[in-house]
């Protein structure tokens, strides 16, 4: 595996010189400062690449930009409405410009409106580390009380709504603010931030789109860009839905093995691949990640290794230590290494980029302003644990 680390650009509290010390060779980053849906021009790509590559002397480790995560797909493309044709043209140009700069692995998602979702950004564990958590009743409270979505009763039972209102009433103002911030797009990986009115407006735009419609929109999008992926040998990799539930009543179409089967049936080619995110897929206990790797290993172009612990009788979960959760990380890594050996035997590029996905906020990072889920020390700890498994298995 090629060991990589997520970096959010010059404003990230974690600096390139810090990341150089954690034991990786690759950087995973995105041009978040470019307006949502607009073209990533050559100048901006080169500018970011220069920062990543820069060293003070020949003795320093030179990092490289390994993965673009994410190249955001505009919601007009996902809904196939508005200016979707314009945004597809912008997207094509971005793909070509990244490829010309030797950035060939590109991650994306097709989640409507909101990217990955958590309701608690400061969930304290027994050891006083801080983790991210998803609480389904808090999600219900957000929809019913804050957004005032009229059809929320179609997704939640009367009992759940009553309980959600009770929970919300007991929440501190700071907790309510944190809930709003998270669910309005306040997490760093989200492509866009919304006001309450904007989010309600955007939800209404998607109201007529069902699961089949969104699948078709993904297919039509891939048909448009696949010739570029193939010509430029781009390893395109869709990220699973996180969590793998419909959010705000909007469909999600990359939540399970059946969805991966559909994706890979559109173009049975490695350029049309997946991001294996163990943390996202494992939220649904019906997802057998080991079987997914065995069946769709050749389509894995990028890896996020993260662990979670599910509540037994609800949709709640929190992000656990990388080696302590519902994901059998040893078995997962064993299967990934097996897939890499298969590629090597077939004389194909075999080093799949992997990053430790999220990390607990620990030690000195608790006294700093950090990006939720992206504590430098927490991710470094997770990376060290994962490297230990890789070393032992090799």
Regions found by a protein language model. Give the residues of each.
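Histidine-acidic metal/acid-base catalytic patches
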Residues: 1-4, 9-11, 17-23, 76-104, ...
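Basic, amphipathic N-terminal segments that precede the first structured/catalytic domain
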Residues: 19-34
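A short glycine/small-residue-enriched secondary-structure motif
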Residues: 21-25, 62-78
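Glycine-rich, proline-tolerant flexible connector loops at the mouths of alpha/beta enzymes
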Residues: 30-47
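Asp-box/BNR beta-propeller blade signature and adjacent active/binding-site loops
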Residues: 52-55, 59-64
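Transmembrane-helix bundle segments that line or gate the permeation/cavity pathway
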Residues: 66, 70, 104-107, 111-114
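Extended, charge-rich helix/loop segments that form flexible
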Residues: 121-214
